[in-house]
UniProtKB/Swiss-Prot annotation:
An example Gene Ontology molecular-function term: ATP hydrolysis activity
Name of the featured protein: ATP synthase subunit beta
Enzymatic class: translocase
GO (cellular component) term, any one: proton-transporting ATP synthase complex
Main location: membrane
Membrane-related topology note: Peripheral membrane protein
Presence of keyword Ion transport: yes
Pfam families according to UniProt: ATP-synt_ab, ATP-synt_ab_N, ATP-synt_VA_C
Residues bound to ATP: 155-162
Lineage per the UniProt record: Bacteria, Thermotogati, Thermotogota, Thermotogae, Thermotogales
Job of this protein: Produces ATP from ADP in the presence of a proton gradient across the membrane. The catalytic sites are hosted primarily by the beta subunits.
Keyword tRNA processing attached: no
Gene this protein is translated from: atpD
Length: 472
């Protein structure tokens, strides 16, 4: 911790501000500096990123620099940006510097932790693997989440990433009575507002903390807001021994914000114009997300894929840190098959018979085999039609189409616009349902019966109703 001192602004380029200090008074890297913006009268926080010589430090602003002028006095706080932690933050909404933005009064029962913290050492980390049940069939069966792991939701714009994240927040709060921390990183302000209102309506807000640095905010705020949310999650893991869910929407915007300030900080850009420190920035965030002997942080990260190009450096760098990848397919979304999770591209490191059990593993692989065979046959069907297939292949196609529809599920958060009540399906029911479809028990049922239902029993009931209405 450096001593408090006062400097003067000598240069302003967008969100990057250079501040000159007296000899021997230089702040440390990541120290928070405070300047009063004469235009607004409010405090503006600047974070020190570089020491550039001549007693000048280069900083990134956490809010708009409009109104700042050269010569303004800047005070060094002598410590990094700090986030509020403790029971008092539950049910509240914050910005990057830990200020409440929900107009719900002052914070009580809290303390402050710096947002830059070391990752837990190897000796503190827990190595046993447990499954985290999400209640979503396609995820629990084909890409199960490890407790304390990192899960990526990959998809372009408009394929349902945010709806899936919101559904999981709801399931963790209501079904698991767990705490969720949501970091809105560079996404639409409207979505943040919708999330807040929906969580209030669903009664899950009291178990959740929301931290926002949205699209309209400067890159400094978007670059650091994930660390603020992570610090709050670390408190619940390390002090209260809780299993916490950390949602980051969107991790691509974290990288994007870093690349915006990187050039202004004087760094040479690397591949596709990203910052040369891309891997380091990502590693500093991701390595802190882990299970310890006290508790766990399971992270679900929505990852926007620019132009649907999965080889772009931002999603590609994120891939290396993930334990499970959920790939959202535009083709499935276009067919109305929600959640639009690609059952063949989505993977999990824990889909292993030694971890999930032999039955779960065999059913999951059986489902993928049938779907892969159906995919291989689609060209033949398009050219020659179903009639040219062998009886065995016809049966595979029928089962695959039922499986495809049974992988869909009505969500609680989409209930308002779909009109179908949401369902939470336990893993045992999910495995039983798909196992019975693979065994051919429901070969005589219409495929429409499997669309947007929860358990296999619901599909059977729906089939009876469809048959009755067909008779009438």
């Amino acid at each position: 911790m450096s001593k408090k001192s006062v400097g003067k602004i000598v240069r302003i380029i967008g969100p990057v501000v250079d501040v000159k200090f007296q000899e021997g008074d230089l702040p440390d890297i990541y120290d928070a500096l405070v300047v009063i913006n004469p235009q607004t009268g409010k405090k503006l926080i600047l974070e020190v990123e570089q020491l550039i010589g001549d007693n000048i430090v280069r900083t990134v602003a956490m809010d708009s620099t409009d109104g700042l002028v050269r010569g303004l006095e800047v005070e060094n706080t002598g410590e990094p940006i700090k986030a509020p932690v403790g029971r008092g933050v539950l049910g509240r909404m914050f910005n990057v510097i830990g200020e409440p933005i929900d107009e719900q009064g002052e914070l009580k029962d809290i303390e402050y932790w710096p947002i830059h913290r070391p990752a837990p050492s190897m000796t503190e980390q827990k190595t046993e693997i447990e499954i985290l049940e999400t209640g979503l069939k396609v995820i629990d069966l084909l890409a199960p989440f490890p407790k304390g792991g990192k899960i990526g939701f990959f998809g372009g714009a408009g394929v349902g990433k945010t709806v899936l994240v919101m559904e999981m927040i709801r399931n963790i709060a209501i079904e698991h009575h767990g705490f969720s921390i949501f970091a809105g990183v560079g996404e639409r302000t409207r979505e943040g507002n919708d999330l807040y209102l929906e969580m209030t309506e669903a009664g899950v807000l009291n178990n959740t903390v929301l931290v926002f640095g949205q699209m309209n905010e400067p890159p400094g705020a978007r670059f650091r807001v994930a660390l603020t949310a992570l610090t709050i999650a670390e408190y619940f893991r390390d002090v209260e021994g809780r299993d916490v869910l950390l949602f980051i929407d969107n991790i691509f915007r974290f990288v994007q914000a870093g690349s915006e300030v990187s050039a202004l900080l004087g760094r040479m850009p690397s591949a596709v114009g990203y910052q040369p420190t891309l891997s380091t920035d990502m590693g500093e965030l991701q390595e802190r997300i882990t299970s310890t002997k006290k508790g766990s942080i399971t992270s679900v990260q929505a990852i926007y894929v620019p132009a649907d190009d999965i080889t772009d450096p931002a999603p590609a760098t994120t891939f290396t840190h993930l334990d499970a990848t959920i790939v959202l397919s535009r083709q499935l979304a276009a067919l109305g098959l929600y959640p639009a999770v690609d059952p063949l591209d989505s993977t999990s490191k824990i889909l292993d018979p030694n971890i999930v059990g032999k039955e779960h593993y065999e059913v999951a692989r059986g489902v993928q085999e049938v779907l892969q065979r159906y995919k291989d046959l689609q060209d033949i069907i398009a050219i020659l039609g179903m009639e040219e297939l062998s009886e065995e292949d016809k049966l595979i196609v029928q089962r695959a189409r039922k499986i495809q529809r049974f992988l869909t599920q009505p969500t609680h958060v989409a209930e308002r616009f779909s009109g179908i009540p949401g369902v939470y399906v336990p893993i045992k029911e999910t495995i039983r349902g798909f196992k019975e479809i693979l065994e051919g028990r429901y070969d005589d049922l219409p495929e429409a019966a499997f669309y947007m239902v929860g358990t296999i029993d619901e599909a059977v009931e729906k089939a009876k109703k469809l048959m009755k209405s067909a008779v009438i």
